[in-house]
Design a protein with these regions (language model features):
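Intrinsically disordered cytoplasmic terminal tails of membrane proteins
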Residues: 1-3, 40, 78-92, 163-195
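N-terminal helical submodule of small eukaryotic multi-pass membrane proteins
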Residues: 1-81
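Extracellular/luminal ectodomains of secreted and membrane glycoproteins with large N-terminal domains
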Residues: 17, 27, 31-38, 106, ...
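Beta-strand cores of modular interaction/reader domains in eukaryotic scaffold and signaling proteins
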Residues: 56, 70, 134-136, 162, ...
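Eukaryotic short linear interaction motifs
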Residues: 32-33, 64, 120-121, 144, ...
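Alpha-helical transmembrane segments of multi-pass membrane proteins
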Residues: 8-26, 55-67, 91-118, 139-157
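Cytosolic juxtamembrane helix at the C-terminal end of the final transmembrane segment
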Residues: 116-133, 138, 151, 155-177
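Juxtamembrane membrane-interface segments at transmembrane-helix boundaries in membrane proteins
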Residues: 1-2, 37-56, 84-96, 127-145
């Protein structure tokens, strides 16, 4: 099966949508707080079993997959025809969407990793010497915000792919026209010589 723009677009969309869904589920499954168990020397936090940390890491993994496929799809030589990167970046629209896709990917990764790592640390370091410790969990809303940014990121990669495809077609059409212009005068001169 040949790699096409449509296949790459579907792959980017699939990974981006999966990252979004996992991030939203992680937000919904996150417990509001742990239960403090008071001991003689401190507080031990008991947290209910939930898949928040695993879902957060999976969401980040699929965000990375969407980004890698999105980035590679922009510069892939479809039908064996390569286009210089400089040609793509001459398009202002492509440059804008490329940079916005990179920025939104970084922001999405930050907003997904921050609560995931925080929640992971809360689960691992659950003994505290402070008797007033309330056993908090990661901030509410970060998983959801990161999930929506992950979806936005994949959409920006798709738009950049569409703009890159248009720039690629324009470049290849211009290249084809230049070859025809070069060949036609040489044929006319050859015809004059034969007569």
């Amino acid at each position: 099966m040949a790699v096409t723009v449509k296949l790459m677009a579907l792959t980017v969309s699939f990974f981006g949508l999966l990252s979004f869904i996992l991030g939203v589920i992680a937000e919904n499954k996150k417990p509001p707080a742990g239960t403090p168990v008071f001991g003689k020397d401190g507080v031990t936090c008991k947290f209910p079993a939930d898949p928040t940390v695993a879902l957060g890491y999976l969401s980040v993994i699929f965000l990375i997959a969407s980004t890698v496929v999105g980035y590679l799809s922009l510069f892939y030589p479809y039908k064996g025809k390569t286009v210089p990167q400089g040609v793509l970046f001459k398009s202002t629209t492509f440059a804008v969407f490329f940079n916005v896709a990179l920025f939104s990917t970084g922001l999405a990764a930050t907003m997904l990793l921050w609560p995931t790592i925080t929640e992971h640390l809360h689960l691992k370091r659950n003994v505290h010497l402070d008797l007033t410790y309330t056993c908090p969990t990661a901030k509410t809303g970060l998983f959801g915000g990161g999930a929506f940014l992950s979806l936005d990121s994949s959409l920006f990669w798709l738009v950049a792919l569409l703009v890159a495809d248009n720039a690629r077609e324009d470049f290849l059409d211009e290249d084809k026209d230049d070859k025809l212009d070069v060949e036609l005068p040489s044929l006319a001169n050859h015809a004059d010589m034969v007569i």
